[in-house]
Each structure stands twice: as structure tokens, then as C-alpha cells.
């Protein structure tokens, strides 16, 4: 699991994707959900090292990467 202390570091999600941890929000609500369907949940924001689309993962499914850059 990652925490705010890991922001800016290389991490890997449980599917094997490697990226840079941008943020961890403990009470994130997805704005794309209808207001009455939103629920607070912890979310980690990961960004591909070479650029691209950021992806969201529960912080419990992310760990520091052991792969060299």
C-alpha cells in the first residue's frame, strides 16, 4: 500500500502497470458519478512515466516499484 509519503515515486499497481504516484486522496468522490451514487473512497492517482493518461487505483492495490527506471 502507498501513502502520501510515496508521492513522486515510482510505483506499480496490481496489474503490473508502472507509473509515478501523483496523489493519494483518502475521501475521493468520483465526479462522473451521479450525486446520489457517489461514495467516498481512498484513491491513488498514477501517471505514466512517459506521459499519457493518468489512472486511478485503490491505494491498497499499489506498491513501490522494484523495477529500475
Where are these regions (language model features)?
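Short, solvent-exposed secondary-structure boundary/capping segments
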Residues: 28-38
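Intrinsically disordered, low-complexity, charged/polar segments
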Residues: 43-69
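Short coil/loop residues immediately preceding or within conserved phosphate-binding loops
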Residues: 16, 41
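Short beta-strand-centered aromatic/proline hotspots
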Residues: 17-29
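Generic cytosolic/nucleocytoplasmic N-terminal low-complexity/intrinsically disordered segments
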Residues: 8, 39, 60-62
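Short amphipathic beta-strand/extended segments with alternating polar/hydrophobic composition
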Residues: 1, 20-23, 55-60
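Mixed-charge, Lys/Arg-rich low-complexity intrinsically disordered regions
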Residues: 1-10
